[in-house]
Curated annotation (Swiss-Prot):
Main location per the UniProt record: membrane
A cellular-component GO term for this protein: membrane
MF GO annotations: G protein-coupled receptor activity; olfactory receptor activity
Protein's name according to its UniProt entry: Serpentine receptor class alpha-33
Length: 327
């Protein structure tokens, strides 16, 4: 472990690179909260998705913002100390005081990842049997299961408790000294994210294939089209979120290995700019807005198309009957 001088610690926390990064995430938080409230209102009022999917999407947006608020709290706590404390000893955090906040931050992040699993399961279930698995209670059950799974996963990652005697300049990571950056907690996130992305892509391929089978019942055809469009929308939204999570975790893992032999304490401020939670908190609800608009347009287009095709097919059918009867 490297010994970091008090002068270097003060430089890291009082750096304008660090302070401007906190100002940036504070501003982005205001935007993300406003967009999220509007997105949740749209999900409630427009009824674009079925009740079970809607409930899971709202849970997803809520926990993305809770995680973002947890991260912003930790960074602002560090910013506060950088302004009002004058010594490195006062600016530094004890592992014991950081641990509950760090675990809370990790838990809320894990919830958003496991919630993507729940959404994938939901869309597969709805595609198989839309009437049985579209109820709000099914979405509520999946949300509860994702919370339980997240609790177990987080407990397994942090059951050893705080690292006694360790002091860091931020409560965000257990060790923010680049040389001591631990990646064993990052690998499981990458595995979960990549698995979810693969499942989402397979779901898109599956629903695209089911789209090719046709029926002559307008209501059945409409229900099937609705399920296909909704499944693709939710899968793409999940992929966007998971890619954002994967980007930071992948970047952090690679960065830790590249700088292991020649670390620089100022690198921790650079890493902070690449944390994608604030960006995710804006992009996810914005994507919901875009997909609601897209689904509504597709719904109207498919209804017109199916009605037109159905009338044409019925016309041909009756014309053939007329020819047969007149023979």
């Amino acid at each position: 472990m490297n010994i970091i001088s008090d002068k270097e610690i003060l430089e890291v926390r009082t750096s304008q690179v660090f302070r401007f990064s906190v100002y940036f995430i504070d501003t982005s938080c205001i935007i993300s909260m406003a967009v999220t409230v509007l997105a949740i209102f749209q999900l409630h009022s427009k009824q674009v998705f079925n009740p079970s999917t809607t409930r899971l999407l709202i849970t997803d947006l809520v926990f993305i913002n809770i995680h973002n608020l947890s991260y912003i709290f930790l960074q602002n706590w560090s910013l506060f100390r950088s302004f009002f404390y004058q010594t490195a000893n006062d600016i530094m955090f004890k592992s014991e005081e950081c641990w509950p906040h760090h675990v809370t931050n990790e838990f809320t992040k894990v919830v958003t990842v496991f919630n993507q699993f729940a959404l994938i399961i939901n869309r597969i279930s709805v595609t198989i049997d839309s009437k049985r698995f579209s109820h709000a209670n099914y979405g509520f059950l999946l949300a509860i299961l994702s919370l339980i799974a997240s609790t177990v996963f987080t407990a397994q990652q942090h059951f050893l408790g705080p690292i006694h005697g360790m002091r860091t300049t931020s409560c965000f990571r257990e060790s923010d000294v680049v040389l001591d950056l631990k990646t064993e907690h990052i690998i499981p996130y990458l595995a979960i994210c990549l698995t979810s992305i693969v499942c989402s892509l397979l779901l898109i391929i599956y629903v695209k294939k089911t789209q090719k089978t046709k029926t002559y019942d307008i209501e059945s055809e409409y229900t099937k089209k609705e399920a296909v469009v909704s499944s693709i929308s939710v899968a793409i939204l999940g992929i966007i979120q998971l890619v954002l999570f994967c980007f930071y975790d992948t970047f952090l893992t690679i960065f830790a290995k590249l700088t292991a032999e020649n670390p620089n304490v100022h690198d921790t401020n650079i890493i902070g700019w690449f944390y994608t939670s604030p960006l995710n908190a804006i992009i996810s609800p914005t994507a919901v807005f875009l997909y609601i608009s897209w689904i509504k347009k597709n719904r109207q287009m498919h209804i017109r198309k199916m009605t037109k095709v159905n009338k044409s097919e019925n016309g041909c059918h009756f014309q053939q009957l007329s020819v047969m009867w007149n023979k």
